[in-house]
Amino acid sequence: MGALRGRWAEEEALRFLLGKGYRLLWRNRRTPFGEVDLFLEKDGVYVVVEVKQRASARFGAPLEAITPGKVRRLLQSARFLLGRDDLPVRLEAVLVHGTPKDFRLEHLVLEL
């Protein structure tokens, strides 16, 4: 995903999640395990959100880019950012299908 398109997709994902009552804690935070796109909180649960965007299915669906290894690294990043591993953490994805002129969002909870 290009930098401008990636930024746009993250903006749309964040707007969507804030509208659902999430509270933003960090954005684009780097850890030794990788970067966290969005780190939020909702109802006492910390939520790591991976944002994936595809303009078309030519290079695969956005979900295909979220591998088991990526899920593991996201969880490690969450624990690193929190500084402990006994707090409730949920991993989610916002998949952005399309372009700024014509898109739809898909919001998923990722299995650990």
Curated annotation (Swiss-Prot):
SUPFAM superfamilies: Restriction endonuclease-like
Annotated GO MF terms: nucleic acid binding
UniProt-listed Gene3D superfamilies: 3.40.1350.10
Domain of life from the UniProt record: Bacteria
Family named by the database record: Belongs to the UPF0102 family.
Name of the protein in its database record: UPF0102 protein TT_C0005
Organism: Thermus thermophilus (strain ATCC BAA-163 / DSM 7039 / HB27)
